[in-house]
UniProtKB/Swiss-Prot annotation:
Enzyme Commission number(s): 3.-.-.-
Binding site for Mg(2+): 124, 126, 155
Top-level taxonomic group: Bacteria
Organism (species): Burkholderia ambifaria (strain ATCC BAA-244 / DSM 16087 / CCUG 44356 / LMG 19182 / AMMD) (Burkholderia cepacia (strain AMMD))
Enzyme class: hydrolase
Protein known as: Putative hydrolase Bamb_4846
Cofactor: Mg(2+)
Pfam families: FAA_hydrolase
């Protein structure tokens, strides 16, 4: 299934794509794509519904983040060896874990706000993993059983706040609008191997990032198992799994960063695309 949330910010309704790619309203069956609705049992109930019997959503509504009430938004850094190289950092021996504040979450086509005074706002196309079942201390072999599905994430980052000012990465990762998620939550049964997905990103039509999840340092299963040893993962938690090379700060000889008035387009095979315009934060 391709599940989504549509409508004005803060008033999103749950939906599903039908066989023709049209949005159908799910709100008579589930209040939101959050919590227990993301469990195996919850998704099984949704899967039993024929989308053709659901109300058709007219027009072109705003698409919100594909998951509601996200409890934890967990980032993984330097998870592609060639990205670590372009960043001038060693390939990690353990996952680099940081937090993205849930207040950064927005829809896949909402605008990106360039923070006041920022000259180093950067892009990162990433595979997002949405937890469906509570898990703690799970084995790698069973880790994917706890996943509800997958989505596209743009891990927007302000490099001065992330790196140059010292301290933790979190503060450069969590500005408002720095977490576009979606458009769809694609359930795990439709993604047989999350380590075989092409992902890409363009700015103003120029392709900067081209990668495949097979080159991750730590696989999705390894990340879920690892994170479950140091925290309880809960339904609706989102793990954004790192980015391939081609970020702005790694461009030689001179880094390239986002400015107001630009267009960012990114996607992952089978998971949909995002399209964002950049603007100065007010």
């Amino acid at each position: 299934m391709k599940l989504l949330r549509y409508g004005p910010s803060g008033q999103e309704k749950p939906g599903i794509l039908d066989a023709n790619g049209r949005i159908r309203d799910l709100s008579a069956h589930v209040p939101d794509l959050a919590g227990d609705a993301l469990s195996d049992a919850g998704l099984t109930r949704l899967r039993a519904i024929d989308p053709a019997t659901l109300p058709l959503v007219s027009g072109e509504p705003r698409i919100g983040a594909c998951v509601g009430r996200v409890g934890k938004f967990i980032g993984i850094g330097l998870n592609y060896a060639d990205h670590a190289a372009e960043a001038g950092m060693p390939v990690p021996k353990e996952p680099v874990v940081f937090g993205k504040w849930t207040s950064s979450i927005c829809g896949p086509n909402d605008g990106i706000d360039i923070p006041k005074g920022s000259v180093k706002t950067d892009w990162e196309v990433e595979l997002g993993v949405v937890i469906g079942t509570t898990c703690k201390d799970v084995d790698e072999a069973r880790a994917l059983d706890y996943v509800a599905g997958y989505c596209v994430v743009n891990d927007v980052s302000e490099r001065e706040w992330q790196i140059e000012r010292g301290g933790q990465w979190d503060k450069g990762k969590g500005f408002d609008t720095f977490g576009p998620i979606g458009p769809w939550l694609v359930t795990r049964d439709e993604v047989p191997d999350p380590q075989r997905l092409d992902l890409w990103l363009e700015v103003d039509g120029h392709r900067y990032q081209n990668g495949n999840t097979r080159t991750m340092v730590f696989t999705v299963a390894q990340l879920v198992a690892y994170l479950s040893t140091c925290m309880t993962l809960q339904p609706g938690d989102v793990i954004t799994t790192g980015t391939p090379p081609g970020v702005g700060m790694g461009i030689k000889p001179s880094p390239v960063f986002l400015k107001a008035g630009q267009t960012v387009r990114l996607g992952i095979d089978g998971l949909g695309e995002q399209l964002q315009s950049t603007r100065n934060a007010r």
